[in-house]
């Protein structure tokens, strides 16, 4: 299981994120914020937990050596501020 913190701060970012996840429809993916977990393929689910101040934990059952999805979600990785 792959897990990564992601940052989705707006409606347009949520739409872009779901566009990416729907390209991988056969892979189970979820987003979790606090006690709430939703299907990462669902725009309604993603919008229901989007909070500009909090990161979500993205999980996916990725096949080994599958890097395409990881590359696609790079724009949503939180930036580290010094």
Regions found by a protein language model. Give the residues of each.
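Short glycine-/aliphatic-rich beta-strand segments at the starts of folded cytosolic domains
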Residues: 1-8
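Conserved residues at beta->alpha junctions
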Residues: 8, 33, 60, 64
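Amphipathic alpha-helical interaction surfaces in cytosolic regulatory modules
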Residues: 12-26, 36-52, 66-71
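Short polybasic amphipathic segments
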Residues: 28-31
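C-terminal structural segments of small proteins and small subunits
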Residues: 53-82
